[in-house]
Structures are given as C-alpha cells and as structure tokens.
Amino acid sequence: MGMFDYKSYSSEESVELFTTAYRLATYANIAGIAGLPTESMVQSISDAVLNSGLYPNVVNAGLPDGWRELTPTDLSLPASAVDSWGQYIIASPITGEMLSGPQAKILGEYDAQGNLTRVAVSFTGTNSPVDIVDYFQLNTGELAPNMAPLLTAVRDFVLKNGLGADDVIVTGYSLGGGMANLMAEYRESLVGGFFADANYVGCASPLICDAPGVVLNYGYENDVVYRIVGDEATWQDAIAAGDPGLVNPDNRYDSTRDNIVLFDDMYASPLWSLTPFSIANIPVAWYAHIDGVFSDATLRIANNPFYEFMARDSTTIVANLSALTRGITWVQDKQTVTSDHYGTTAFIIGSQYDDLLQGGVAGDYLYGGAGNDTIKTGAGADRVDGGAGKDNLRLEGSQSDWDVYRLSDGTLFFNAHNGTGLKQAEGVEQISFENEWLSWTRPYDVTASGLEDNRSLISWFDQDVAYRKATEGTTGNDVLSVKAVFGQDGNDVLTALSSGSLLHGGEGNDALKGGSGNDALYGAEGNDVLYASAGYDQLYGGVGDDVFRLGASANNTHIMDFNQANGDHDRLLFAHTVFGSTAALGAAAHQVANDVVIAQGNFHLTVHDALLQEVLYSSAIIVG
C-alpha cells in the first residue's frame, strides 16, 4: 500500500514514476517563459536567496537526471513546430497558434549507453494571459483533437525507438495538468488510441478525468486550482456545482489524492481562515498552487519512513514554512474551513530544517526529517520518528504521568497513566514535558538505561526515569502472554493476564486478546483482530482493516480509533449470545454526543468519535 500506487506497478516503481512526472510537469511550467532561460534564472535566484534556509527545501528547477528536451529534428518535425519560447505549439480552437497559447514540452530519458528508455509529453501551465480563454473549453474537450498532430509525431518517434505507449509519461502542472487529464479522457480516440496505455499524471489539475486505473491526480487541499472544475460537462456546470463566490467545493474523486496539505506561511496565517477559498482570491488561495511548483513535498512524502502505511487519501500535512515562521509555528492538522479530515489519523512530515510538529486528537504519524525538531504528541496512539538531527519529543503532563519502555533496538514506548494513548518513538534523543517548563530548555536525555534528568544544576536533585520491564517479541510469529508485551514484526498472538496487560502487536496481522483485568490493546499497523473481555478495556486497532470481537464478557469496552485513518475498513463482530439479531443490536445502539454507545444488560461498549450509522453498517453478528 502506498499513496502513489498506480496501475500494476510496484510501490517503488509507482513512486519513481510519479515523482519523475511531477518534476517534468513543473519544469515545463517554468521553462522558456517569454523566450528567456527562465528555468536557469529560477535556479540561480533560488541558489542565491532561497536555498540557504529561507525556503523549506533546496529548489531544483532542472530536469531529472537522464532527461533532455526533444527537438523538432528528433521528432521529424519542422522547426516551426516550436515557438520562440521553445515550446511545441498546440493550436487553440479560439486563438489558433497565437504565441503562448496551448504548449507542451516533449522530453526523452536516456540510459548511460545513450538508449532512449522513456518519452514524456509535459503540457505547459498558464504562462501568459493568452491561456485564459482556453480554460473555458477544458471540460467540453474542443482542444483534444488539436493535440493530434504533435502526438502523432511523438507516437512515430516512440515506435521508431522500439518503445511502446507504456513507456510514455503524460503530465502537466495546473492548466498543463488539465490538458494531461483531457488527453487521458480522449486516449481511446486520439492518434488511433495509441496512447491508451500511456502513464497519465496530473499535477494541481483543475480538470479531473476520474479514471483511477488511467490517471493519477495529485494536488494540495489548500490549492484552490486543484479540482476546481472537476469532471463536470461544461465550465458553466462546474460553476453551478461549486460553492458561491467561485469557492472550491473540495470534491473528491477516485483518481485524486484529496487530503494533502502544504503547510506553508499562508496556511499558517490568520488570513487563511478570514478570507474565502475562492479562485478569485489570488494572494491567499493560490499560495500553495505557486508553492507547489518549487516544493519537494512529493519526495518527502514518498521517502518518509511511514510511507508504506499511507493510503491514497491519507491525511497528510507537509511542513513548508519559511525561515520567517518555521521557529514559531506548530505544523499540525488544524481545524479550518478547507478541511473535512480534522480528527483523522494524520501523517505529519517535517522539512530538512528545525521544525515544530504537533499531533492531534487521533493516532498520528510524525516524522521530523533532517534538522533538530521538536515533536509534540497529541491525544491518540501516536508514532514518532525524529529522523536525522537531535530531536526533542514533548509529552503532555509531567514525567510522573508516564511509564516508559525501551526495546532492544532503541524504540521507546510511553504509556500515559490517564489513558490518552501509547506513544511509540524512534530517532529521538531528548524528552521534555508540557508541565515541566525547565525540561523545555534542559530536556531529559535518552540513554540506554533510562531518561536522564538535566533540569537541576545539582545532580543530587535529578529525577531520572528508569525504563519499565516488558517482553519483546521477535520478527517472527510470536505467542505471548505477559503483563506488558510489544510484539514487533510478524503475525503475533498476544494474550492479557487476568491482572490486566498492555499489549502492542506492532507491524503484522496480529490477534490481541483481553483478559479479566483492565487491558490496553494496540493492534498497530496491519489487519488485526482485537478481542474485548471483562474489565475496563481500551482497544486501538491502528492503521489497517481491523476487527473488534465483542463477547458477552465485554462489560466496559472502549474502541478508541474506529475507522480513524482514511482508507481503513474496520469491523465490529458481536457474539450471538450478546445480540440475537441486527434489530436487537440497532435497538441497543445510540449516538451520545460524538460517541456511539451500545449497551444491553451487562454488555457495554463505547465507540469513540464515531457515527451511529457507520458503526452499524460495519457491524455483524456471528456464531462461534
């Protein structure tokens, strides 16, 4: 599983294809504007001003290694096929071949021996006012037939070099992304259907071809251009389907990635919530659209250590703050008018600099990346990787509010006494606590034997924290029954003691069984089965399609993360000894504020932060 999975390619192949296509798309967007070497100019300005730390990443405006522009001679076309801006001309049905109308770059990838390996059609985004008139015919498709002359030459070049349509990438950014989606829509008829099996990647596209097996569409939730006209039949229909004031309706499609936030300076500012998310609000609503051309957020998503747990629509927050705001702004899944995913599991990804990252109310994944980061956990079962640098993990309360465990590989677990979720941490060197302000500047050091207190100038007053004892599983399939156990990898079977246990399955498809005491069950990553029993039990399925088994002894069970991650399909299976029919189950279920409570006799279940209809839809009664 991966956010950028596409067609039948492996996850690694999909990532390479997508990130390459994105680079090609942004290159075409900035290259040769007004006939100037603007791609080189952008790189020079970035190197002189931005790349020293002002911008959140090193801007790379050039082509990926091995790629070059293909000339008219390469494609057996006359020199007039390219305009004075160095772009291939596509005639507009309205403006004809007017300079800076519809354009494209045709690019080739060559191996070390000089052999052509792939070809790309990268449609150009808006680079002059001439393009504006073509916005109004994207949905109706009048432009599609005019692509045929150039695409015919591309087809012939591909075949002449022994390649096929599956060796072709079709991409573009902004308007260029819209043209890539338009070509995808007409792939069966253009040039005899040759490009039906090409690889289509739309970047920040206003138009959406909603065919997930054909096109991968990527953009940012806080980019007003992305999905603005959707897949409506005409631009008039798109306006009618949108919100008043030309506000982006934030529609979802099967081919789009829908919950990614580029957390930039504008998104962090008060202006974000005070002004409309309208296509007409260029200074505010277009900020991420422009930022997306230069950001390396796509690479940071793909390279983060939690990528394998991400689904197509996982809530993803990517730090993209400048040096002006980076040191004073917490990057988080914030509650705002442009978001409908607040409270879901979020993947929060830092930059190469010193970031402030903060978890929310769900079980989040936080990755610092390079730099000396401060990472603050939230209310759920969070997982943290500090990355490179000297990173500080900040926890709620005081050190006395936590039990701390350390595994043989250095992984830390922090179990909160107040039941706000287990925190897993890797790659962090320091620990601080919200209620111990001295620890903010003099944090505890993580050592092999415990947390070393540095708050006092006199070591006699130190309150070092020793690690608690726990049983650690192997990378295989373990069967364990102890007080505190961390299963690690493998498909484990973990059983609680009668006195109560802390069970953590780790990665893999695990079975966790509660006992007669008060238990905390954490399935973590994988498709897990969690069995509730007597006592006060807290069940966290984690990322994956988890099953919660509920028998008659479950007298005080709390499911803490039901379908919390986008893409999860959790289920509740009730024993027939509890409810004899779905009608009886429905009669016992009630919405109580944000939770669902199911109670009958001694049986009592609370599904936190859930809707009654969703819980009942995901429930079944079983025998055995």
In which residue ranges do the predicted regions lie?
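Low-complexity acidic/polar repeat-biased segments
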Residues: N418-K469, L585-G624
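Generic recognition of long tandem-repeat/solenoid scaffolds
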Residues: L107-E109, V121, V404, D409-N418, ...
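Short glycine-enriched nucleophile-adjacent loop
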Residues: N181-E188
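Acidic, glycine-rich calcium-binding repeat modules characteristic of RTX/beta-roll
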Residues: D354-F433, Y444-V446, N477, S481-A584
